[in-house]
């Protein structure tokens, strides 16, 4: 997870610096239509108006399905020895870097964080973790260790699948946040209708989401390992015999 996070942050940084040095980079990554729409919304005093378009439930279904699809592609990218997984991280990293730069360049950086990262904290973290699952699968193929390659592959595939399945509820919650909560928060910065959520609500959601990701996927596994626990083939947590 640490390796995947560092690589993803590197790709995001490349996206930011590329946007800073090439005005057309943002349009090339996000598309002219999206950039033009965002600039029109900013000019109208409703910079995050895109999150108010459409039926919330329809958005919830589509966003949830799309995010799970991206995660699944990152997972099966492990069958390509991690190359396709890396490609997905590259594309999403550049997109995120260009996307955030667009708002910071308009003086809307902090506001964009308070609105977009309500759902983005869980969504982006889950995609990075899904990529980690892809690399676990690739590692089982490339580095069998003392196991036969077929056995190593099966072990890697099983571990990676468990990680991927654990992400499904997170993607569902992220889709709910984007469709309903981000929808409300976007109204906070609508000059014509600033009846959205208070800033403190956004900060609380961001903090809780980030704390959950760090605790469940980083701290908790480390603590289990230090206490001598391990995960059985059937997924049950057990303790090593002393």
Q: Where are the predicted features?
A:
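Small-polar-interrupted transmembrane alpha-helices in polytopic inner-membrane proteins
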Residues: 15, 70, 85-108
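Short juxtamembrane and helix-loop transition motifs at transmembrane-helix boundaries
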Residues: 44-56, 80, 90-94
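Hydrophobic alpha-helical transmembrane segments and adjacent short intramembrane/lumenal linkers
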Residues: 100-208
């Amino acid at each position: 997870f640490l390796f995947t996070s560092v690589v993803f942050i590197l790709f995001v940084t490349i996206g930011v610096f590329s946007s800073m040095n090439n005005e057309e980079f943002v349009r090339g990554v996000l598309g002219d239509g999206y950039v033009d729409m965002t600039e029109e919304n900013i000019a109208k005093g409703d910079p995050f108006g895109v999150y108010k378009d459409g039926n919330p439930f329809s958005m919830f279904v589509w966003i949830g399905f799309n995010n799970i699809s991206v995660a699944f592609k990152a997972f099966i990218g492990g069958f390509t020895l991690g190359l396709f997984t890396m490609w997905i991280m590259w594309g999403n990293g550049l997109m995120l870097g260009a996307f955030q730069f667009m708002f910071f360049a308009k003086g809307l950086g902090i506001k964009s964080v308070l609105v977009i990262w309500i759902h983005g904290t869980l969504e982006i973290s889950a995609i990075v973790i899904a990529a980690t699952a892809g690399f676990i699968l690739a590692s089982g193929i490339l580095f069998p260790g003392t196991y036969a390659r077929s056995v190593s592959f099966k072990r890697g595939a099983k571990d990676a699948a468990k990680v991927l399945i654990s992400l499904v509820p997170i993607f569902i919650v992220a889709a709910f946040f984007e469709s309903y909560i981000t929808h409300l928060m976007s109204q906070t910065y609508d000059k014509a209708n600033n009846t959205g959520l208070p800033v403190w609500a956004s900060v609380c959601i961001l903090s809780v989401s980030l704390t959950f990701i760090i605790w469940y996927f980083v701290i908790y596994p480390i603590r289990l390992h230090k206490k001598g626990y391990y995960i059985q083939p059937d997924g049950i947590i057990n303790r090593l015999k002393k």
